[in-house]
Design a protein with these regions (language model features):
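Cationic, low-complexity basic patches in intrinsically disordered or flexible, solvent-exposed regions
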Residues: 4-5
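Short inter-helical turns and helix N-cap capping residues of alpha-solenoid HEAT/ARM repeat scaffolds
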Residues: 312, 342-343, 374-375
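Iron-sulfur cluster-binding cysteine motifs and their immediate structural context
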Residues: 208-231, 248-275
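Amphipathic alpha-helical scaffolding segments comprising HEAT/armadillo-like alpha-solenoid repeats
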Residues: 297-302, 328-340, 359-371, 391
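Structural detector for internal amphipathic alpha-helices that build alpha-solenoid repeat scaffolds
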Residues: 316-328, 347-359, 379-391
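Auxiliary alpha/beta "docking" domains used to position bulky ligands
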Residues: 14-202
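Short, charged low-complexity linear segments at domain edges
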Residues: 173-198, 225-244, 295-299
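Glycine-rich phosphate/pyrophosphate-binding loop
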Residues: 280-317
Length: 391
């Protein structure tokens, strides 16, 4: 039984049985589409703090995450009186029920599984909001703060502490039920719930994820150099390094290699939430139409996907890389037209792609562009393209 007295600010007091409330929360979570829930203490993540500091020293972080290590590892800085954290997980599909139409010569790219269906940030927000409302109704005056991977806390560490799963060598939370195909969210609260036990790490001696990583971004089990991760580069704006381009293939957003290689994901494919179901033509879109899509068309078609958060520019650049990967000579006219695009990274990547695909037409276009181009990075790409054609 917990009694929280009122204080000088006039906050209402309340008395509740936390064990009963915890069970009520667990049962309610099942009715609103939360697939797994766990409870953890809100003590600082001391070991994690040292690892994150080391990551910063090595320049291994992506830059998309919260830069303040203290905020990432100390829940008390995010909520006054933080006593525990409720962690949730939602399972997402690993396979598409419907297949895309396959026609010879029509090349496609693909979005990673975590980007299928409705943006998972919105789905998690919906579930956490409902959970908040339930707890507030049970405990008037309670303090809570919810977040997803865009928040301050390191969600994988929270999920691990709360017994959702273990932290795999592929830097993902692996659950016994759903593998690593789960979205994570958490809620800090001033209610001191009894914490759940963490799950034993079951990776063992397996290193399949490390071996499957196309760029060697998994430095060692549980340590990622985001600056080498394909998923990171598909989300950046600007030029992609040559060595990464060669590994991207036809990925438009994200990379699943370290997940599909994991034995714990073998046979895993849950379709529990209709809003997560992928639309085949969005998950695996045709490449050439992407080159000419307008901002309005892109937002209308892809705007509800998590993979659209950086806008159309990275997706278009990645589509160019994918066409080069396929050496699709039917795209030559499209790529030659992009040599006049106002965006340097699009012009430059198109020049590189023309060099990869090859042919007299590509060579003539690159030579003509070299006499007009003024951007030094684009000029470098044009020279690289011409050098490939001379081989």
């Amino acid at each position: 039984m917990l009694e929280q007295p009122g204080n000088q600010t006039g906050r209402n007091s309340f008395m509740i049985d936390l064990n009963v409330l915890k069970q009520e929360i667990i049962e309610y979570s099942r009715t609103i589409g939360i697939d797994k829930i766990g409870f953890a203490s809100a003590e600082p993540f001391t070991a994690l703090k040292q690892r994150l500091i080391r990551q910063q020293q090595l320049h291994y972080q992506s830059g998309f995450e919260e830069p303040d290590v203290e905020k990432r590892t100390n829940p008390a800085l995010l909520l006054d009186g933080a006593a525990s954290i409720i962690a949730i997980a939602l399972a997402y599909p690993a396979k598409m029920k419907k297949r895309v139409e396959s026609k010879k010569g029509l090349r496609r790219g693909f979005f990673c599984r975590a980007s299928w269906g409705l943006d998972y940030h919105e789905i998690l927000k919906d579930r956490l909001t409902k959970l908040e409302e339930f707890i507030r109704a049970k405990v008037p005056g309670v303090k809570v703060k919810s977040m997803r991977d865009t928040g301050e806390l390191y969600d994988r560490a929270v999920a691990e502490r709360a017994g959702i799963g273990w932290s795999g060598k592929n830097c993902a939370i692996i659950t016994p039920e759903f593998g690593s195909y789960v979205y994570l969210g958490e809620m800090i609260t001033n209610l001191p719930f009894e914490p759940d036990e963490p799950i034993e790490n079951m990776c063992g001696d397996c290193t399949k994820c490390l071996e499957a990583c196309p760029t060697g971004a998994l430095v060692q089990g549980g340590q990622l150099n985001a600056k080498r991760c394909i998923s990171y580069w598909t989300q950046t704006k600007g030029f992609v390094p040559d060595e990464i381009r060669e590994k991207i293939g036809n990925r438009l957003y994200g990379c699943d290699s370290c997940q599909t290689a994991c034995p714990k994901n073998k046979g895993i494919d849950f379709h529990l939430h209709p809003e997560m179901e992928p639309e085949p033509e969005l998950a695996k879109p045709l490449l050439k139409p992407l080159l000419h899509v307008s901002n309005r068309e892109f937002k209308k078609k892809f705007g509800n996907m998590a993979g659209a958060w950086r806008g159309k520019r990275p997706i278009q650049r990645n589509a160019i890389i994918a066409l080069a990967h396929f050496k699709d000579d039917t795209a030559l006219d499209d790529l030659i037209g992009l040599l006049k695009d106002p965006r340097p990274e699009i012009r430059g990547t198109a020049a590189w792609a023309l060099g990869k695909i090859g042919g007299k037409e590509a060579e003539e276009a690159l030579k003509a562009a070299s006499g007009k181009e003024t951007d030094w990075e684009v000029l470098r790409e044009i020279e690289n393209g011409l050098a490939m054609l001379r081989k």
